[in-house]
Amino acid sequence: MAKISRLFGSTVKAAITAQAGFHGKRIPAVSSLQEHIVKSTPARYNSTQACLENDISGTDNKGFKGHDMLAPFTAGWQSTDVDPLIIEKSEGSHVYDMQGRKYIDTLAGLWCTALGGNEPRLVDAATKQLNTLPFYHSFWNRTTKPSLDLAKELLDMFTAKKMAKAFFTNSGSEANDTQVKLVWYYNNALGRPNKKKFIARAKAYHGSTLISASLTGLPALHQNFDLPAPFVLHTDCPHYWRYHLPGETEEEFSTRLAKNLEDLILKEGPETIAAFIAEPVMGAGGVIPPPATYFDKIQAVVKKYDILFIADEVICAFGRLGTMFGSDMYNIKPDLVTLAKALSSAYMPIGAVLVSPEVSDVIHSQSNKLGSFSHGFTYSGHPVACAVALEAIKIYKERNMVERVNRISPKFQEGLKAFSDSPIIGEIRGLGLILATEFANNKSPNDHFPPEWGVGAYFGAQCQKNGMLVRVAGDTIMMSPPFVVTPEELDELIRIYGKALRETEKRVEELKSQK
């Protein structure tokens, strides 16, 4: 083992700081095949870190080891023993560290800087609003014009199903917490006090606050936090490559998952199930596009039992998939919608909840009875955040960003999927400007590389060494470049990916020879 550990350089440590992979305890209501894989991942994650920890010896001490931040999604040893990668400047699709090194930011920050790192119109919008009205709240029927304008804009542009009201938050996590409170408020108003349970999916990501982390189907967000909350259930992840049965078609797979969902509803009692929440394409769980008819079948089930459908569009909205919203891509007709990230291109923290007339009318009536709708945040509808979001939406429309994504995404998708024949790649999946590579031994979803090899972390380190940042989660690599990425930058991205892959193939071959 020590011999294998020495094969890993200190650059791997920098790559694994981005990990928030698939690890943890059993998720309820997951099929036995999926359960086996979910339960097998904690050892993979932990032993990879243990192996890498043996070689924490960065050569260029920048003086920030043991810094003062309790860093999100970061292991303690990383903060104490490894200098963080400190990003100082951004331009377009690139970011620069404190030493002036330039990187292609293939994850657009965290799936969010859709307009790149230095869009002057967004800076100007923020500056103008700061000079006019830097803050005012939206409580007690007092508010600001940017928040009213943004609410109208969002309601007008979401066309998958008519929406009637918008509620503003500071993040996707807060927005999904709000969704739960709205649904409970709604069912209480209708005299259904027992209809309170939520169904999410294994490998889903819906946030990291108390309730949104419970909805999330990545057990690392539950472990030692006493989560998930008891009112949250999880059903199957729609990842066909990994979870289909032998000989099962995508259509049959989707039918089985819909049947499993219905069985779960019947087991719990339809009168207890309030809502189903789903990302159109799963993001942090590994970029998992569903089979073509999956959402049609799922929606039929939830509608049958009077269960609300919440579309978590935090990653997919505003063009990421090649449609303005992910709901447009998959014919989803949600009752509630969650937005954040690209809403402001991440230049200001802001999230939103869109509420259908059927739900908002009930909430309106109930708030009249109670004298108030007693939910909100100090910064709900912050005028600066709303002004920036309004300008971002103007840019998306004026520059035809959806059309642009459709124009450049074939180069991105086809250029990377051309590497699918690599002996260490199990699957490359994605659409639009979002993609994942999953490494697998013998190209099989059921044949993992030994966890101590850290194949994904090594690939990520090679990318970083060559001027590109990717997201590493176990042996899955995720990418979602800014919408403004150029064809030339995509050529460079593909070149670095290929170089990192060749180095990783060599490393895997070397490790196999040590067994």
From Swiss-Prot:
UniProt modified residues of type N6-(pyridoxal phosphate)lysine: K341
Protein origin, superkingdom: Eukaryota
Keyword set includes Transferase: yes
Entry binding sites for substrate: Y205, K341
Catalytic activity: 4-aminobutanoate + pyruvate = succinate semialdehyde + L-alanine; 4-aminobutanoate + glyoxylate = succinate semialdehyde + glycine
GO cellular component: mitochondrion
Tissues expressing this chain: Expressed in leaves, roots, stems, flowers and fruits.
GO MF entry, a single one: 4-aminobutyrate:pyruvate transaminase activity
Chain positions recorded as pyridoxal 5'-phosphate binding sites: G172, S173, D312
Keywords attached to this entry: Aminotransferase, Mitochondrion, Pyridoxal phosphate, Transferase, Transit peptide
Transit peptide: 1-57
Pfam families attached to this UniProt entry: Aminotran_3
Signal peptide residue numbers: none
Class of enzymatic activity (EC top level): transferase
Gene3D superfamilies: Aspartate Aminotransferase, domain 1, Type I PLP-dependent aspartate aminotransferase-like (Major domain)
E.C. no: 2.6.1.96
Places the protein is found: Mitochondrion
Gene Ontology BP terms: biotin biosynthetic process; gamma-aminobutyric acid metabolic process
NCBIfam families: PRK06105.1
Role played: Transaminase that degrades gamma-amino butyric acid (GABA) and uses pyruvate or glyoxylate as amino-group acceptor. Cannot use beta-alanine, ornithine, acetylornithine, serine, glycine, asparagine, glutamine, glutamate, valine, leucine, isoleucine, methionine, phenylalanine, histidine, lysine, arginine, aspartate, threonine, tyrosine, tryptophan, proline, or cysteine as amino donors. Acts predominantly in vegetative tissues.
Similarity annotation: Belongs to the class-III pyridoxal-phosphate-dependent aminotransferase family.
Protein name: Gamma aminobutyrate transaminase 1, mitochondrial
Organism: Solanum lycopersicum (Tomato)
Name of the gene: GABA-TP1
